[in-house]
Amino acid sequence: MSVRARAVTIALLLGVAGGVPGSLPAQFGYFGQNKIQYQSFAWRVLPGEHVDLYFYPEEEELARVALGYAEESYGVLERRFSHSVQHRIPLIIYASHTDFEQTNVLPYAPPEELLGVTDFLKRRVTLPFTGNYADFRHTLRHELVHVFQLSLATEAYLRYPRTTHAALPLWWTEGLAEYFSAGEDARDEMILRELTVSGRLPTLPQLQYAGGGIIYPIGGSILRYLGTTYGDWRIASLYHDIWKYQSFDDALRELYGRTLAQLSDEWQYWMRRRYFIDVAASKPLALTASLITRLAIKPTAYRLPGDTTTRVLYFSPADGYASIYSRNLEGHDTHIVVHGERTPQFESFHYFESRIGVNPAGIAVFGSRFESRDALMFWNLKADKLVGRYQFPDIVSILSPTWAPDGRSVVFSGLAVSGYSDLYRLWLPEGRLERLTSDRFQDIDPSVSPDGRTVVFASDRTPFGAQGAKNLFLLDLATGTVRYLTYGNWQDETPRWAPSGRIWFTSDRDGSLQIYSVDSAGTGRRETQALGGAFDPQFVDSTAGFVFGGFADLSFNLYHATARSDTGPSVVALDPAPPSATWQWPELTEPAVAQAVPTPYKQHYGLDFAAGEAAVAPGLGSEQGAVLLFSDLLNDHQLVGTVSSFAYSGSGFGNLLDNISGSLFYLNQTHRTNWGIGAYRLRGLFYENDFTSLFQETSYGVLGQLRYPLSRFRRLEAEFRLEHSDRFDFASSVVSEPRRVAWLAANYLTFVKDNSLWLPTGPIDGERYTATAGLVNDVNHGRFDS
C-alpha cells in the first residue's frame, strides 16, 4: 500500500501518528459512508510479458505508459530479489483519484492519501494517476515491491510449511517498498530531520507494532541505512531464508550479525550524523517568525472591503474534519468559514495540494468535491454564504484557483478525464471556459501577475521532469507562449506574485523546503533558512511581511515574518539558455508497449475466501458449516454461498440432511444502484426478543436488495423477501397459534445518514442514524405478520 507524504501530512496535521481518520464502508442494513459508482467503465485489458493491465478507453495512452514502466520495474525487482513471480500480475489503473474512489477492489472508498494498494487475495495492484508522471512511477514500483514480497512469502510457506513463521513488521515491508522505488523526498526529509533533531526518533523495537503514514519515511530510511551499510543482497536473503527463523529478531541477528537493538543504535547514530549538521546552518521557526496557528496548511492573506485588518484563510482539521478557517495575523479571532467533509457539496477540499484565492471584493474561490467531480466554489466572505458554483464535464479535479486582478476571470489547474493536468481560465460571469495549456505535463499552482498579462505556474515540463523535478514557468496570456522562470533538477512550486512584481515560491534546491523570491527575469534570493522547513508563501506588504506554512514540533503550522530588504544578495539566477526541449513519456516508444493489442475485459469468477467449522457436543449432537465467497477481478460482481447443518446425537444421516441450511446471494456493483438477488433455506432452533422466546422454523425463499446512494453520506436501501415459513413457537402461552405455515411477503425501506468521523478507537464526531419502515404480509391468511 502506498500512502507516502500525503498520509504523513494528514496524520501530523491531526496530531495522530498512528493512523488517519476514516469511515466505515457502507453495508446493507448497517451504517457506513457510501462509495458511489458515478459511471460504468468500459474495461479493457492490455497484456504485457508479466503484467495484465486493466484500463478504460479514456486513459489508453496512460495505460501504455503504465504497462511499460510496470514491465521495466518487474525486471529491476526480479534482479534485486533474485525471484520471479509465478503468476501474471493484474494491474488496474484509474485516470484520477476521483475515478479511483469508485473502485470495488476495496470494500470502502479509498481516502485521498491512499495512492495505491496491493491486495492479498488476488494479488492485484490498483492505483490512480494524479497528474504527475514521477509520482505515478514511484507508486507503481512501490506496489510491485509488495507483489514480490507476497510471492516470496507464499513460496516460503508452501515449500517449508511450519506452524509459525517470522512476521515482518510494517516498517520493514513499507520501508523496503519506499527504498526500492525512489526513496525520501524533501517532505520526508523534513519529517525525519525534525524527529532526529528533536530527539523523538523512535527505536526499532518501538516500531515493531507501529502503523500509520509516518512509518513510510522512517522505514525507508532504515532500509536505506541497511542497504548502504551491509548491502542490498542481505535484504533479498532475508525473504528467501525467512522460513528458517522463529522471529524477525532471529532473522536480523543471523543476516546482519546484530541484534535488533544494536541495529537500532547504529541507525540512530547514522541519522544524527546526517541531520545534526543542519542545526548549525538553520534556525528554528520560533526564532525567526511569529506563529499564527498550529495544525494548518495553505495560507491565503486577505482584507475585506473597508477593513484594514489582515486576515488569513487556511485549511485545518482542528475539529477532525478538514474545514476552511479564518484568523487574523496575531492568531486571534478564529472562526470556521466553510465546514468541510460533512455535506455533499463540500465533500473534500484537497487541502494538501490546493489553495484558496481571494479577490479585493472579498470573494473566495476554491475547489471542492461535489458529487462526481470537483466544482469551483465562490464564497462571499463578508456575507458568509456561497454565491457561485461551476462544474465542467471534462474536468474531474480542480486545484489552486486564483483570481485575475480585474476580478473578471479565475485561473486554475484542472485534471481532465484522460488524466492530463493543464491550466484553465474561467471567464465571469458568463462561465466560459478557456484552456490555457494542453499537453502531458503537470501544470499546477497558477498565479496571475498584477498587470493581468502573465501567469506563473509550476510544471514538470523540464528535462528533469521524468525524475520528479518541477520548475517555474511564465505563460503569456495574450500569445500563449511559455518560457522558463527557474531551471534546475529540483522542485520549485507554489509560486505567488507579490504586488511589487516579485514572485515568491517554495523550492527544495538546497536539500530542504525553503522560501525563495525572484523577479520576472528569474533572478532572486532565498528568503528563509528554517530548520524544519518553510513553504506555501504569500507576500502581503512591507508592514505585514509574508505569511507561509512551516513545519515544527511535528506539526504543520502557519507563520508570518518580515521580508528581507530588496538590497539583499542574489542567490538565484536563471540559466542564460535553458533548453527548449522538454521530455516525452519514454515508455510509449517501446515496441512491446506500442504493439500491445487491448481486448475487452471478461468476467471470470475466482474464489476469494473459504471458511468452515465443525463442533461436536457428546450426547447432544454435531454442527458444521462453511462459507464461500467468489468474485470477478474487479469485484464488480460477487457471489456468496453458505451451507450448514446440525444433527441430534444418534439421529442418523437422514436427520443431518433434513437439517441442512444454505444460501446463495449475488451482488452487482457496476452501477450507482447496487442490487442483489438470492435464495435460501433455513432450518433450526432460534431465539428472539430477550432470548426467552424459543421457536423452530423451516423456511425457504428468495430475496432482492437495492442500495441507492444519494450522496457520500446518505442512501436509500430496499429489500423484498418472499418465503415459505413453517414455524412452531415453544412458548405457547405467548402466542395464540403455536404453529404457523404460510407464504410471507416482506418489504423494507431504509434511509441511512452517516457523516461520522472515526479513529481506530471508534467514532469521535459527526452523526449517523437510520430509519426503517417494513411490512410483512401473511399471503395465505390475508394478514400482517412479524
Q: Model regions: which residues?
A:
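Transmembrane beta-strand segments of outer-membrane beta-barrel domains in Gram-negative
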Residues: 674-786
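Beta/coil-rich, acidic/histidine-enriched accessory regions frequently appended to metallopeptidases
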Residues: 30-37, 42-45, 208-213, 237-355, ...
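A flexible loop/linker signature enriched in serine peptidases of the S9 family
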Residues: 292-294, 315-325, 340-353, 365-377, ...
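Active-site-proximal alpha-helical
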Residues: 53, 77, 171-187, 194-261
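Outer-membrane beta-barrel strand-turn architecture
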Residues: 305, 452, 507, 550, ...
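Short coil/turn segments that connect the beta-strands within blades of beta-propeller domains
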Residues: 308-310, 361-362, 406-408, 451-453, ...
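Outer-membrane beta-barrel initiation region
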Residues: 556-557, 562-676, 740-765
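Juxtacatalytic substrate-recognition/specificity segment
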Residues: 26-169, 186-188, 205-208, 251
